[in-house]
């Protein structure tokens, strides 16, 4: 089920605090490291760079206007796809 229309989009309070602090100190080019992958990207985040934790490292995510309304976790994959093993048959001549 989707979130109720009556409720505002979820964004963790500590993420909002970090963003407000970065905007107040005019540190728009610095990376803001966050663990909250479930937070929704808001309008005030446009132009900022976030380091979204994927369980091992912080993946840099530069927010643009196409990302509004989506979650941070969508841009930081947690699993690494190694691909399928190729066909190991021996070719005969």
Curated annotation (Swiss-Prot):
GO terms for cellular component: cytoplasm; small ribosomal subunit. It comes from the Bacteria. The lineage of its organism: Bacteria, Pseudomonadati, Pseudomonadota, Alphaproteobacteria, Rickettsiales. Belongs to the universal ribosomal protein uS19 family. Gene3D superfamilies: 30s Ribosomal Protein S19, Chain A. This is Small ribosomal subunit protein uS19. HAMAP family: Ribosomal_uS19. Keywords: Ribonucleoprotein, Ribosomal protein, RNA-binding, rRNA-binding. NCBIfam families: rpsS_bact (TIGR01050). The gene is rpsS. The keyword Ribosomal protein applies. InterPro entries: Ribosomal_uS19, Ribosomal_uS19_bac-type, Ribosomal_uS19_CS, Ribosomal_uS19_SF. The keyword Transmembrane does not apply. One of its GO terms (biological process) is translation. Protein S19 forms a complex with S13 that binds strongly to the 16S ribosomal RNA. One of its GO terms (molecular function) is rRNA binding. PROSITE patterns: RIBOSOMAL_S19.
């Amino acid at each position: 089920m989707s979130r109720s229309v009556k409720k505002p989009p979820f964004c963790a309070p500590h993420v909002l605090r970090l963003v407000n602090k970065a905007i107040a100190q005019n540190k728009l080019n610095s990376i803001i490291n966050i663990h909250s992958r479930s937070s929704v990207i808001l309008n005030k985040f446009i132009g900022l760079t976030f380091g979204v934790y994927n369980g091992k490292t912080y993946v840099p995510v530069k927010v643009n206007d196409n990302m509004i309304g989506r979650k941070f976790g969508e841009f930081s994959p947690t699993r690494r796809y190694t691909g399928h093993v190729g066909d190991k048959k021996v070719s005969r001549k």
